[in-house]
Amino acid sequence: VSTATVSKVLNGRADVSSATRARVQALLEEHDYVGRRTDGAWRSGQLTVELVFDGTLNAYCTEIIQGVLETSATSAVTVALSLRTPAQHHAPQERLTAWARGLAAAGRCAVIAVVNDITTGDLKALARARLPLVVVDPLNLPNARVTSVGSTNFTGGFVATKHLLGLGHRDIAYLGGPARAACNRARLHGYRAAMETEAVPVPEGYVRSGHFRYDDGVTIGAELLDMATPPTAVFAGSDPTAAGVLEAARARGLRIPEDLSVVGFDDTQIARLSSPPLTTVRQPLREMGSMALKTALRLAAGETLESHHVELATELLVRGSTGPPPA
């Protein structure tokens, strides 16, 4: 069967015999092909994009959602929000295929996944359903061709650590997210690179992994502060984690920033409401959400992208949680 004939069947053309049409449809079924119900949507401008989170919504996610919604409001695009747990990403292939087929049948034109653990099974299911995927701040990239939107995490980690070094700190710890997360690895590499530029060694136990959560900052921050030689500064991989470190410091009677300096990452509302306000690396989260939606719509329209990976600039915002080390 020729490509032209398959195209005619997919587009409902009448100039195809019943026998040929049946053969093509059988082949499509055999290869798990799912047609998207978006042709009419493109003509009417009624498009829907699926926005998928990993099962938790926090201040970071809220900023991403805001960026997506602000752009959707000016693009006549509907956004459907859903949550998927890590276990759902690692489900049997038939369940992943059913998930993607369900999205296609519901008229979704693309999927945006935020901080998700994307698997090869996800990619296969979405490809079969002809649903383009854009990942925001991916935990992993199983395929170099996966389109992603993120920020300059390495630069952010480097600048945050250089700021602390510039204040005179030498005992600087890094408390990040999951060790395998791409964004965390980049921030950690930036931290290590900055330490190397000043020939400052990283003591054993000064690099810790968590899940970018407040509780990590409290518990792991306490472990750091209870070390025989505790750090005088902590660079945290997220604002919630940094806020947790502040709490661990207060519980030990430490003053911020006189006794301990803390830097966060993201510049969410948590950073602005902390006491003192948190020095942090600003990720342009709303812009990342906006860029993800624009990119998803371009892919859904069949456009070719200049690059599959977009990184938006980070910026260090110095507030009240950092100062010189104690004398």
Per-region residue spans from a language model:
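Glycine-rich phosphate-binding loop signature in dinucleotide/nucleotide-binding domains
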Residues: H31, A104-R108, L167-G168, L224-P230, ...
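Alpha-helical recognition/docking segments in bacterial nutrient-uptake
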Residues: S44-K162
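N-terminal helix-turn-helix DNA-binding module of bacterial transcription factors
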Residues: V1-G45, P326-A327
